[in-house]
Structure formats: structure tokens, C-alpha cells
């Protein structure tokens, strides 16, 4: 009976913080706190418990591919020949100086 009680107590104990597989990084890419990262993972930062935040390479690359749309180019202010002629006609002082 005593052995059963000891086993029951050990089974119901919560693991410590370092034994838990904690999630880390941000909302877009989830990583796991580990001492050594797996082959398909990259250590990106340190977790609170001193372990590495291991991120999956495929998820990280997929997140980098999602980019913001490019900014619209500003309108160019190039004058056409007709615009230039209109400007000259509106300024009579320029006409008199050029003749």
C-alpha cells in the first residue's frame, strides 16, 4: 500500500519549469525551449530558463515570404511640351524678354 501511495504522489506532481517544453518567440512562428535544437530547427534567442528558443526552419522561411505589398510610387511631375507652352503663354513677362 505504501508503494502505491508513493507512485501515485510521483505521478501527480507537476514537472518543474526547466522540464516543461515551453513555447517561445512570437505569434507568427512558435518555437520550443530546448538545450539542443533539432536538425530542422535554428536557435534564435534565449528562453527565460536559459535554453535556446528553437524555431522550425520551414516555418521561419514561410513567415519571411509573407511580405507587405510594395508602396505605390509617387506621381512624377514631368511636364509635357503642351504644359510648358501653356506656362509660357500665361507669363507675358517671359514672352517679352525672349523676343
UniProtKB/Swiss-Prot annotation:
InterPro entries: Beta-defensin, Beta_defensin_dom. Coiled coil: none annotated. One of its GO terms (cellular component) is extracellular region. The keyword Signal applies. It is found in: Secreted. Its main location: secreted. Pfam families: Defensin_beta_2. Keywords: Antibiotic, Antimicrobial, Cleavage on pair of basic residues, Defensin, Disulfide bond, Secreted, Signal. GO terms for biological process: antimicrobial humoral immune response mediated by antimicrobial peptide; defense response to bacterium; defense response to Gram-negative bacterium; innate immune response. Disulfide bonds join 24-53, 33-47, 37-54. Belongs to the beta-defensin family. Has antibacterial activity. This is Beta-defensin 127. The lineage of its organism: Eukaryota, Metazoa, Chordata, Craniata, Vertebrata. The gene is DEFB127.
Amino acid at each position: 500500500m505504501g508503494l502505491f501511495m508513493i507512485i501515485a504522489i510521483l505521478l501527480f506532481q507537476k514537472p518543474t519549469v526547466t522540464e516543461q517544453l515551453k513555447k517561445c518567440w512570437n505569434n507568427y512562428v512558435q518555437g520550443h525551449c530546448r538545450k539542443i535544437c533539432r536538425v530542422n530547427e535554428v536557435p534564435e534567442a534565449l528562453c527565460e530558463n536559459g535554453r535556446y528558443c528553437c524555431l522550425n526552419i520551414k516555418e521561419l522561411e514561410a513567415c519571411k515570404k509573407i511580405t507587405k505589398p510594395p508602396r505605390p510610387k509617387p506621381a512624377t511631375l514631368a511636364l509635357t511640351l503642351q504644359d510648358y507652352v501653356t506656362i509660357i503663354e500665361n507669363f507675358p513677362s517671359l514672352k517679352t524678354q525672349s523676343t
